[in-house]
């Protein structure tokens, strides 16, 4: 059985992320989406909300599960019994950063990283950009899964009142 981990903060999960999850799920027997905890960062959505949003957005992927990850990604990968990391790449800048991380992960833990080129329709999408556009009143419904878009709208409407 082959398995891979798709790590990230997913604050919030976007359709670009879901596209990578779907493609990973087609290549691996099991995929774990690792929602990583970074104590130095405070996101818009808390950990429980991010878990719920990823689960709600991936119900169509029976070989995918969602877990919380702490510490080094490679330690998480090994604790899950997985052997690989899958990362989506939007730009050359993503590649430069992720290549260094992949080489370090291979060096310290023997974990391989598989890069998946983001679908062109999502190449400009990021969680940060989606939140920023939504905060300024823009429509991000084509960038986010419906359950995520609904939660984001609700959050912003609550903050405005």
From Swiss-Prot:
Compartment annotation: Cytoplasm
EC number in record: 2.7.7.3
Activity regulation: Regulated by Coenzyme A (CoA) through feedback inhibition.
Entries under Pfam families matching the protein: CTP_transf_like
Protein residues bound to ATP: 9-10, 17, 88-90, 98, 118, 122-128
Keywords from the UniProt entry: Acetylation, ATP-binding, Coenzyme A biosynthesis, Cytoplasm, Magnesium, Nucleotide-binding, Nucleotidyltransferase, Transferase
GO molecular function (one): pantetheine-phosphate adenylyltransferase activity
Annotated site residues (Transition state stabilizer) in this chain: 17
Enzyme class name: transferase
Origin superkingdom: Bacteria
NCBIfam families attached to this UniProt entry: coaD_prev_kdtB (TIGR01510), cyt_tran_rel (TIGR00125)
Record's subunit section: Homohexamer; dimer of trimers.
Protein name from the UniProt record: Phosphopantetheine adenylyltransferase
Taxonomic lineage of the native organism: Bacteria, Bacillati, Actinomycetota, Actinomycetes, Mycobacteriales
Gene name linked to the record: coaD
